[in-house]
């Protein structure tokens, strides 16, 4: 039969039906105690085999078969094993149906089991029942969690609990005392180490089912014997904790099964005093945490209970510290603390009232007691080795319950502190901080030894988040003092903390650090957070905000963020790239964000620097620090000694060279008062202070620094493609690179070294184009636009650059009014327009140039801050107009002021200069250098002194110690002195130039006082001549063997007049740096030309023939250098021409004049052309003079009268004659012993242009002895006219129209030579008629026209008529230009 049943159970459904019928029939036949059970066990075994083969399709029929058998079987007294086999088979089938997901069959079978009474034949049978009930409970709880059959699952859970109650009652009835084993299985399978969700779902089951199970369990435990108490204690604690969780969520607040269990347990362990007292303490503690209403004595009760706990642990159990029950009790307390602290933040927490009563009055005291309790438990937990209550770590390397317990105590302490909401006055109470820090620090120290912890560990994540929350709640220094001691232990856990969690904590600490009492600690904490930011943009903004907040508080920045981070108690681990990013961000924040960083801050960055590049950039901010300067010198020397330099090395060398350049420029500056800038005190001034060291040799060191910088920067850009920068290199500070390049270019421009400054500005032009820096590009282009001619060496196509600049300007100038540009940028744009106008004027596009200047005027008027002020834009605009005016061949606007008047206006504006931007000061200095050259050229060609620009420029260059610029000013001054024939001043300028060139130092002896002239006659004559005219026209009338009064006493240290002039060409005595520099050679050559002119004017023509010949050859052999001379080239040609006429080499003079006319550049004064024309015509006349009658000796008819004042013009003719008589009488009295004079009369046939222009290019042939032809350089009446309405003198001898009486026509007879002896006779004075000018004519400014430019010298200042003389005698006049 067994074989048939086994086969049929594994067969089809009909076969199983047959088995059911067979079993039903069989049980009708069987009777007795043992046979039904034996047969039933056999059938159950075959059903188990069928389920084993996964044949669960007929599980419902299997349950029907078991439903037939179960009610008919009972335990067999003779065979206990059969009942055990019966229960085991039922358990197997129940488990098998659950595993095979036969839920309905499982429910059906379980109902069959629970419908039968619980029969425990043996004591061990309860285990099978217990296993069946727990399996059924856990299985349907899983279904309930998955929301599958929720109603049925809930019913099955209740059935299981009720069945457990029946089991516990049966055990009590059978007096089975194996409670410890039962509780172990219950805790392992049902209550122990379950989740909160399990207990929450269990608490919501019907209370009747729970009560039935729990009451039966309590009765069973109460009947336990004392022999099993040792094993029962930890299980009771475990069950208590489970019931506490059930009570937490139970809707019936008065149930509190955990307290019932503890009351029963106290009775159970009453013989064990320590265990009983421990359970009693736990009972009261749990009772206190389940308080449902606020009580007035809660704080006192809790403090008292905590003190009892501490007393119990410290005194009563001191001798039992290592016993197992104490370890279990400490673990139980830890688990209980975890329970009550986990729910403290929930609004509907069952312990909400418990935690609420911690607040209010005496809040610090109760929290102190709570923290002390946790600290005491944590300190005793060190003796825990094992405990069944302890959590089982999933990590194989960690089996320590002790470490997890201690860590849990620390987390609970932090939870309690987070829950604390102290009042404002309670925050200052730090009494709870000590026990809190004790337990937390201890737990953190233990955590670092745990091998199971990592970035994903729950404990570490919770610890960091708790600290984050604590930091977020900081509102005072006392609360911040809780966090500070925890930072160092936390740093030891840093490898276990995830970067995201640490970043969040550091962010809260960053905010909380504002309440830190120690500013240094606050900076360290803030640095930790800043280091944790990996996003470059966010890091930059946060670092800048950090410095902004420090500056807002007025706190001095002592260290950089990078250095603070290195010393912080909680450093953020950084990779080398992240460290570099942090330092670079901190570094550039100081450079670009902080306006005036502290020295300590910059020194901190220097200490932490990773390359020399950082040092040289910071040195730009620390020019006055000697130690930094020494370090820069060391870097500079080190880089110069290296054979090959990388791109970054070149960049460092460039910045270091600029730093040394600026330091040297600053060191040579001195204060010079404007009162000291007087022409007769120049030599004494240069011998004072540190100006005596001002020479080209000293300045060459500065030029070398600047050249090194430009060369290094150029190499950095040239090798960009061959040597790209790697990601590890420091970020390039392009702004600092541009600034230093501009500073170098400005320094070279200020010093005046043309070739070097061209290279610097060309590099800036490239940089502006490559970096798309529009304003740098325009600023560099301004330099080349302002030049008369760009050097071909640069290979610069200026026309193409102008096209690019015009596109940029078209885009920029409409935006200038928006207010988004700085004033220096506005200035750059407007200056570019001005220089473009100058460029187009050189291209003879005068209309376009004037339109550009008009556009600048209109654009400038749109800025209120510039209106009514003399800014650099206005000065540049007026300078360009002045340049266009005095260089233009055919002026188009006749109403423009004359060039000299424009210079006066420009001078007034320079004196009232207003500095509006950082660009204006340097631009003004460069503009003044140009104005010195151009104003000197303009005024010298018009025989006028305009020394104010030279005075201002000299003041600036002397204060800056610029030797080359000083030489240029002295050369311009020397040119003016020679034109005005101030020989002593000219000799002084030569000495000053030689001093600055380093050829001959000035004599440091004091300046000798000028000796008085003993000859009274000569003294009176000199004083009279000085008053009459500063150009000393009477000097040209003295005898050839008489020395000039100005030259009677030469200064001891004047340039040796016998010194060879060829030295200026051969450079025999010149220093080495002068022989190597073409620009210095040009200046030295110009000095020689002016020195030769001085020799000529001093009647010393001994070496002039050879010098002018060699000078001509020098200019022919060196065209680039000669073309760089500009106006001095034409002046030298005029000087040479004067000498040739003096030497009667008229053919050569004519060729020289013609060559000068052909070589005239567009960038020189138009008067040079007129002077060449005048000299050419004069030389032609001298070559073929007009026939002359023999001169007749006549008596002197009148004395020489010069420079009538405007008041004299109002006098009558009689008054004028009287004045002339008085003057002649005075001259006669003062010159009784004076030498003879030779006075020539004017020829009627002499061309007016020859007489009017002969002195424009120089002094003419002053030393030409009397000859058969008329001397063209004879003394002429000086003609100065300010009258705009004065008629122009035509080339013909026509009678001019006048409102006054018409002038008589002069006779056409030739002048006769009059010989005077030592005494002058007073003869009848001719009548003089003066043309009266209107008041309006005197007030108006002269208007220059093309005709007046050439013929203004013909305007008659005064007309002397001799009505009674039969032959009218007229004194030959020598005019000088005044336009």
Swiss-Prot record:
Residues 1248-1267 have a biased composition (Low complexity). Residues 1031-1037 are annotated as: Separase cleavage-site. Changing residue 1035 to D: Abolishes proteolytic cleavage. It comes from the Eukaryota. Its main location: cytoplasm. Changing residue 428 to T: In strain: Berkeley and Oregon-R. Transmembrane segments: none annotated. During embryogenesis, expressed in Malpighian tubule buds, and epithelia of foregut and hindgut. Residues 1206-1231, 1248-1309, 1328-1379 are annotated as: Disordered. GO terms for biological process: cell division; digestive tract mesoderm development; foregut morphogenesis; gonad development; head involution; hindgut morphogenesis; Malpighian tubule morphogenesis; mitotic sister chromatid segregation. GO terms for cellular component: cytoplasm. Proteolytically cleaved after the metaphase-to-anaphase transition, C-terminal cleavage product is degraded. Cleavage can only proceed within complexes that contain active Sse. Changing residue 392 to T: In strain: Berkeley and Oregon-R. The keyword Cell division applies. Keywords: Cell cycle, Cell division, Cytoplasm, Developmental protein, Mitosis. It is found in: Cytoplasm. Residues 1213-1228 have a biased composition (Polar residues). Required specifically for chromosome disjunction during all mitoses; maternally provided protein is sufficient until mitosis 14 then zygotic protein is required. Involved in formation and/or maintenance of epithelial structures: bud extension during Malpighian tubule development, and foregut and hindgut morphogenesis. Interacts with pim and Sse. Cleavage of thr contributes to inactivation of Sse. This is Protein three rows. It comes from Drosophila melanogaster. The gene is thr.
């Amino acid at each position: 039969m067994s074989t048939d049943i086994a086969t049929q159970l594994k067969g089809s459904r009909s076969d199983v039906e047959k088995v059911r019928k067979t079993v039903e029939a069989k049980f009708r036949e069987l009777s007795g105690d043992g046979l039904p059970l034996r047969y039933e066990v056999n059938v159950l075994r075959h059903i188990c085999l069928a389920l084993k083969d996964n044949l669960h399709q007929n599980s419902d029929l299997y349950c029907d078969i078991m439903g037939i058998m179960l009610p008919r079987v009972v335990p067999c007294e003779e065979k206990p094993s059969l009942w055990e086999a019966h229960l085991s088979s039922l358990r197997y089938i129940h488990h098998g149906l659950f595993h095979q997901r036969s839920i309905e069959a499982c429910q059906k079978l379980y109902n069959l089991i629970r419908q039968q009474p619980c029969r425990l034949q043996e004591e061990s049978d309860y285990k099978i029942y217990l296993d069946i009930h727990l399996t059924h409970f856990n299985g349907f709880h899983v279904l309930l969690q998955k929301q599958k059959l929720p109603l049925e699952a809930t019913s099955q859970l209740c059935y299981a609990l009720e069945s457990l109650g029946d089991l516990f009652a049966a055990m009590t009835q059978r007096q089975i005392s194996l409670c410890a084993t039962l509780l172990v299985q219950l805790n392992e399978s049902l209550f122990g180490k379950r989740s909160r969700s399990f207990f929450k779902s269990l608490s919501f089951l019907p209370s009747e089912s729970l009560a039935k199970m729990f009451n039966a369990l309590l009765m069973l435990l109460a009947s336990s014997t004392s022999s099993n108490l040792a094993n029962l204690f930890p299980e009771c604690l475990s069950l208590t904790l489970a019931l506490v969780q059930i009570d937490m969520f139970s809707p019936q607040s008065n149930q509190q099964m955990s307290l019932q269990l503890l009351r029963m347990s106290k009775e159970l362990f009453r013989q064990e005093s320590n265990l009983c007292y421990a359970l009693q303490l736990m009972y009261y503690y749990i009772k206190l945490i389940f308080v449902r209403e606020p009580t007035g004595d809660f704080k006192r009760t809790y403090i008292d209970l905590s003190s009892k706990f501490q007393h119990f642990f410290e005194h009563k159990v001191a001798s039992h510290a290592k016993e197992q029950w104490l370890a279990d009790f400490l673990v139980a307390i830890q688990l209980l603390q975890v329970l009550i602290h986990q729910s403290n933040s929930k609004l509907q927490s069952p312990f909400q009232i418990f935690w609420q009563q911690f607040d209010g009055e005496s809040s610090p005291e109760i929290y102190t007691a709570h923290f002390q309790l946790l600290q005491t438990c944590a300190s005793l937990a060190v003796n825990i080795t094992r405990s069944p209550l302890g959590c089982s770590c999933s990590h194989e390397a960690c089996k320590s319950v002790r470490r997890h317990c201690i860590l849990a105590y620390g987390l609970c302490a932090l939870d309690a502190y987070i829950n604390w909401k102290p009042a404002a006055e309670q925050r200052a109470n730090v009494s709870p901080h000590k026990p809190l820090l004790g337990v937390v620090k201890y737990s953190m120290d233990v955590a670092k030894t745990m091998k199971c912890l990592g970035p994903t560990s729950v404990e570490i994540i919770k610890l960091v988040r708790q600290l984050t929350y604590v930091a977020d709640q900081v509102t005072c220094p006392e609360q911040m003092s809780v966090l500070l001691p925890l930072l160092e232990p936390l740093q030891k856990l840093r490898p276990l903390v995830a970067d995201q969690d640490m970043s969040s904590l550091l962010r809260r600490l960053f905010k909380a650090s504002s309440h830190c009492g120690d500013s240094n600690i606050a900076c360290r904490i803030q640095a930790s957070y800043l280091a944790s930011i990996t996003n470059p943009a966010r890091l930059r903004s946060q670092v800048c905000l950090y410095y902004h907040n420090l500056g807002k508080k007025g706190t001095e920045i002592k260290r950089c963020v990078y250095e603070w981070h290195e010393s912080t108690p909680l450093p953020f681990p950084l990779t080398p790239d992240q460290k570099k990013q942090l330092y670079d961000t901190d570094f550039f924040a100081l450079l670009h964000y902080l306006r005036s960083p502290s020295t300590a801050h910059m020194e901190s960055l220097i200490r932490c620097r990773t390359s020399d590049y950082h040092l040289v950039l910071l040195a730009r901010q620390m020019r006055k620090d000697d130690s930094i300067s020494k370090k820069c010198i060391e870097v500079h020397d080190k880089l110069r000694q290296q054979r090959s330099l990388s791109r970054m090395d070149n960049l460092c060398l460039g910045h270091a060279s600029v730093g040394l350049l600026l330091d040297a420029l600053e060191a040579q500056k001195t204060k010079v008062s404007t009162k000291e800038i007087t022409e007769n005190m120049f030599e004494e001034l240069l011998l004072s202070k540190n100006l005596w060291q001002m020479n080209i040799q000293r300045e060459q060191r500065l030029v070398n620094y600047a050249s090194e910088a430009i060369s290094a920067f150029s190499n950095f850009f040239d090798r960009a493609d061959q040597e790209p920068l790697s990601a590890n290199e420091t970020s390039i500070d392009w702004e600092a690179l541009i600034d230093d390049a501009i500073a170098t270019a400005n320094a070279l421009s200020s010093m005046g070294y043309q070739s070097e400054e061209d290279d610097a500005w060309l590099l800036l032009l490239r940089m502006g184009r490559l970096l798309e820096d529009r304003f740098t590009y325009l600023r560099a282009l301004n330099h080349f636009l302002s030049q008369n001619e760009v050097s071909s060496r640069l290979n610069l196509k200026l026309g193409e650059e102008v096209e690019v600049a015009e596109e940029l300007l078209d885009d920029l100038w409409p935006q200038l009014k928006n207010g988004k540009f700085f004033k220096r940028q506005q200035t750059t744009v407007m200056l570019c327009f001005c220089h473009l106008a100058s460029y187009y004027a050189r291209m003879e596009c005068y209309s376009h140039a004037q339109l550009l200047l008009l556009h600048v005027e209109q654009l400038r008027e749109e800025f209120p801050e510039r209106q009514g002020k003399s800014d650099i834009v206005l000065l540049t605009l007026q300078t360009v107009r002045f340049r266009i005016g005095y260089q233009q061949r055919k002026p188009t606007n006749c109403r423009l002021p004359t060039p000299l008047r424009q210079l006066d206006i420009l001078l007034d504006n320079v004196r009232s200069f207003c500095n509006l931007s950082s660009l204006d000061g340097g631009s003004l200095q460069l503009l003044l250098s140009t104005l010195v050259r151009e104003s000197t050229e303009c005024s010298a060609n018009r025989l006028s002194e305009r020394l104010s620009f030279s005075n201002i420029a000299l003041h600036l260059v002397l204060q800056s110690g610029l030797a080359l610029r000083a030489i240029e000013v002295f050369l311009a001054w020397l040119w003016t002195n020679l034109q005005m024939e101030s020989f002593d001043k000219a000799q002084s300028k030569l000495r000053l130039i030689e001093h600055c060139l380093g050829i001959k130092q000035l004599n440091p002896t004091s300046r000798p006082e000028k000796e008085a002239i003993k000859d009274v006659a000569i003294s009176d004559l000199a004083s009279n001549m000085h008053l009459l005219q500063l150009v000393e026209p009477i000097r040209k009338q003295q005898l050839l063997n008489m020395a000039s009064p100005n030259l009677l006493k030469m200064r001891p240290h004047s340039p040796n007049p016998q010194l060879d002039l060829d030295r200026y060409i051969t450079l025999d005595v010149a220093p080495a740096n002068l022989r190597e520099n073409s620009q210095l050679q040009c200046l030295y050559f110009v000095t020689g030309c002016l020195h030769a002119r001085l020799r000529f004017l001093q009647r010393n023509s001994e070496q002039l023939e050879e010098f002018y010949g060699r000078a001509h050859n020098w200019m022919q052999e060196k065209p680039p250098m000669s073309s760089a001379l500009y106006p001095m080239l034409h002046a030298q040609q005029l000087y040479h021409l004067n000498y040739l006429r003096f030497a009667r080499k008229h053919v050569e003079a004519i060729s020289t004049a013609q060559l000068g006319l052909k070589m005239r550049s567009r960038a020189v004064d138009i008067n040079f052309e007129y002077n060449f024309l005048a000299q050419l015509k004069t030389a032609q006349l001298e070559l073929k003079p007009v026939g002359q009658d023999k001169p007749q000796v006549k008596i002197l008819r009148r004395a020489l009268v010069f420079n009538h004042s405007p008041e004299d013009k109002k006098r009558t003719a009689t008054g004028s004659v009287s004045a002339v008589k008085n003057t002649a009488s005075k001259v006669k009295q003062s010159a009784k012993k004076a030498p003879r004079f030779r006075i020539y009369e004017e020829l009627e046939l002499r061309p007016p242009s020859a007489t009017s222009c002969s002195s424009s290019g120089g002094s003419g042939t002053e030393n030409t002895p009397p000859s058969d032809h008329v001397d063209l350089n004879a003394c002429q009446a000086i003609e100065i006219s300010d009258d705009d309405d004065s008629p122009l003198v035509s080339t013909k001898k026509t009678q001019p129209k006048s409102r006054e009486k018409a002038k008589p026509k002069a006779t056409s007879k030739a002048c006769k030579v009059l010989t005077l002896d030592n005494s002058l006779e007073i003869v009848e004075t001719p009548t003089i008629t003066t043309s009266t000018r209107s008041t309006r004519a005197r007030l108006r400014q002269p208007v220059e026209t093309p005709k007046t430019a050439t013929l203004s010298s013909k305007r008659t200042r005064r007309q002397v008529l001799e009505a009674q003389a039969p032959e009218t005698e007229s004194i030959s006049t020598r005019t000088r230009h005044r336009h």
